[in-house]
Regions:
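Structured catalytic core of nucleotide-sugar glycosyltransferases
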Residues: 2-10, 51-61, 66, 83, ...
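Active-site metal-binding motif and surrounding structural segment of the metallo-beta-lactamase
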Residues: 27-74
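Conserved beta-strand hairpin/beta-sheet module of binuclear metal-dependent hydrolase folds
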Residues: 1-38, 122-138, 155
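Metallo-beta-lactamase
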Residues: 76-131
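Active-site neighborhood of phospho(di)ester-bond hydrolases with catalytic His/Asp-centered motifs
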Residues: 22-25, 45-53, 73-76, 134-137, ...
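Conserved catalytic scaffold of divalent metal-dependent phosphoesterases
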Residues: 100, 106-111, 115-116, 129-133, ...
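Cap/insert and terminal regions of metallo-dependent hydrolase folds
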Residues: 144-210
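A short helix->loop->beta-strand "cap" motif at the edges of active sites that frequently abuts
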Residues: 18, 68-71, 201-206
């Protein structure tokens, strides 16, 4: 995890020599520095998978993909929203279905819809040679598609965003509390824990809490 939280999100997934970024919500300079720290460069990246168009997920995406000619994969709704934000990267943009399976290099990528207040949010599962990692962040609920796609995943990066009682009694304005708590907001600690238990019963053994 190169960055996680409301100030920026970026995740590196490596699968048999294929390196992918999920989101680019920090500056391109920070991403390049983080890659350099682990012995990689943008030239080693096979593509950027975009979950949705909120700023904390796209802050560095235009600069990174344009400067280094990296393919950018996004759902149609996210792609259109990205262009409306004047971060249009149409020359490197590749539209993918909101649900389905495709391959980039050695990585098999499963796409599934999430429930977030964005144009057409998605998340991913990446499989290679019997190993798998799933990503489920920025969703108000665990969608049926996410539940199905993530069964048996080896490691899950899982949103665990808030304690509901603490959030309600905290300093955030009412409208923001309602947004976070809503079905198209963010996953609560309790909901994340319940989903993690279900996956653990199916064999998932590693969880990384995020956002």
């Amino acid at each position: 995890i190169l960055a996680s939280g409301s100030e920026g999100n970026c995740l590196l997934v490596s699968a048999g020599g294929t390196h992918l970024l999920v989101d680019a919500g920090i500056s391109a300079r920070r991403i390049c520095g983080a890659l350099q720290a682990i012995g990689l460069s943008p030239a080693d990246i096979s593509g950027v998978l975009l979950t949705h168009e909120h700023t904390d997920h796209i802050c560095g995406v235009a600069t990174l993909t344009k400067q280094h000619r990296l393919p950018l994969y996004a759902s149609r709704g996210t792609a259109e929203a990205l262009c409306r934000k004047s971060s249009c990267v149409s020359d490197v943009l590749r539209v993918i279905p909101r649900a389905g399976v495709f391959n980039i290099g050695n990585a098999q990528i499963t796409v599934f819809p999430t429930s977030h207040d964005a144009a057409e949010s998605i998340d991913f599962r990446v499989d290679h040679d019997g190993a798998s990692i799933g990503i489920l962040t920025d969703t108000g609920v665990v969608t049926p598609e996410a539940e199905q796609a993530l069964q048996g995943v080896g490691l899950l990066v899982l949103e665990s965003n808030h304690d509901e009682e603490w959030l309600l009694s905290g300093p955030y304005p009412y409208y923001l509390k309602q947004r976070i708590l809503g079905a198209r907001g963010h996953l609560s600690n309790a909901a994340a824990g319940a989903f993690a238990r279900r996956l653990a019963e199916g064999g998932t053994r590693q969880f990384v809490l995020a956002h």
